[in-house]
Amino acid sequence: MTASCIIGQLNYNDLYGGGSGRGRYMMPHRLLVYSTAGLFTATGIYALLAPQPYKKPLKFDTGLLHRVAAIGATAGMLTEVVLGFITARTADSGNGSGLKQKAQIHDAVGWTTFGFMTIAGTAWLF
């Protein structure tokens, strides 16, 4: 996810932030995103299939923080896939109407999703 965000930011800067506009980072970003989405999906399936070890009351602890952040990351990841597809298809069609705005939203959601994943991972570790 970290590499996807960094290369995605470089791609955004290249295409919409005053870069050369050659699309130098498009393919690396695409490959990283596919692998990130695949690993995220596999991890989510693994987590959903894990047995519940014991019942415990709902209280604010690292387990709850992890669950809330993981739900946020999942919502963000689904949004990223949809926004990325829409933005890429808009760019491919040559329709520049609202393209930069869609790319900005995609960029912001990507970093927000990264934040949720970081929180979920940190809560899981500690």
Per-range role (PLM):
Residues 1-126:
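Hydrophobic alpha-helical membrane segments
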